[in-house]
Amino acid sequence: MTDGTSQYIDAKMPTMPEEASMHADTNRPDAIACLETDEDASAHARTSQERMSASGRSLSPRWLRIVSIIWSGQAVSIITSGASGWAIIWHVTQTEQSALMLSLLMMFSMLPLGLLSPLGGVVADRFNRKAVMIVADLGAGASSLVLALLVVAGTRSFALICLFATIRSVFSAFHAPAMTAAMPMLVPERHLLRINTLDQLLESISSICAPAVGIALYTAFGLAPTLIIEFIGALVACAALGLVKIPTVKVEEESTVAEQMRVGWDALRVHKGLVMLLGGLTVGLMAFAALGAIYPLMATQHFGADGTMVSVAEAISGTCMLVGSIVIMAWGGGRRLALLLCASAVLIAVPIIAAGLLPSTAFWIYAGLMGLASVFMAWFNGPLMTLIQQRVPEEKTGRAMGFFYALIGLAMPAGIAVGGVIAEWIGIPTFFVASGILFLVIGLFGYLFKDIRALDAPSQASKAPL
């Protein structure tokens, strides 16, 4: 093909018609060939990308079937576990009649996830992630079965229930990093946020169904049969995992657990924007956990709602979070995930601030506003999870996600404890307004930082080496 200079000279110099015709004939095929080559290269790039998983592995043509099998088993496990958890809560409510005891139970159910998830991430990167998930599911299910047998034998002390709640949370600390580290190896990058949102979707379904199912099963059959149902759900999840193949990552050289944890943190720290978003997410989850804990008090003390009204309002919030999860799964979240996270914080803030300013006669408006906040809360942590999976090498993803779940596991009980004290001090409606302003600051100012905006740049799509 002729270069740009000769084309310019040819255009300026007079030519005979025959020469012009001959010149055009020699240039046209080259131009067409160049365009065809560019189009072929672009099509080849798109095809190659579609054949690769988010972690850069060759993608199985049956990837959707594999993921569907895994998540079908997890769906059964999440719903049966949620029903069992509510049966335990109802049992403690009826037998102990103490808010302190319920708070302790919740603390034992959350803290191990926060404290042990970094270790769970090390295990997820060291061993086959499918095996880690199966052992974790079996361990959690077996602990419920043992507790059921002890209840049948007549042993049902509060201390024993807290012990088994702790054990279940320990197994969750190993299951969660392995699960989220496995997904990028199985799913195309453009569908990764959708798959990550499945967990939120199932949790939303569980939050709607589990209280009614768990309390109904407890009332009809007692605590032990409900715990056995959770064990059956764990077996279903393990059976589903047994039907699929999950690749094994390359194991690094032997090193201490502390050194391996540090490698996971360094994999996050190399992207300053990820660390900043993790900080914002942690603060936001602390605020939202506190709002969830005082939600019934706001309803009863400020609006004078009864138990039925509170139950309906809780169902509205759960349904709206389900709707938010479905929307993000259908949409896919777009390419600018850091912007999506910051925008969702703003969209969460507005209804929460409005809810704190309502008069005491506007309960149903309050329920609607909190439902609206729940829609956008479903968009809050999925983008960050996806950004971590996209940017951290697959052999370090488990450890990176371990820190992600550690922050979540610690943020929620810390938020409940600190938020309760602050709400007592400044008043519950004022606390709602303050929490909304906090979300507003996270959203509006977060995206002003260059390191956070850089996460949405095309050049950041590849995983940076350490």
Residue ranges and their predicted role:
Residues 115, 119, 132, 146, ...:
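C-terminal transmembrane bundle of multi-pass solute transporters/carriers
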Residues 181, 185, 227, 231-256, ...:
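Helix-loop junctions on the cytosolic side of multi-pass membrane transporters
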Residues 68-85, 108-122, 128-143, 160-219, ...:
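Substrate-agnostic recognition of the 12-TM MFS/MFS-like secondary transporter fold
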Residues 56-111, 266, 270-317:
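Helix-loop boundary and gating motifs at the non-cytosolic
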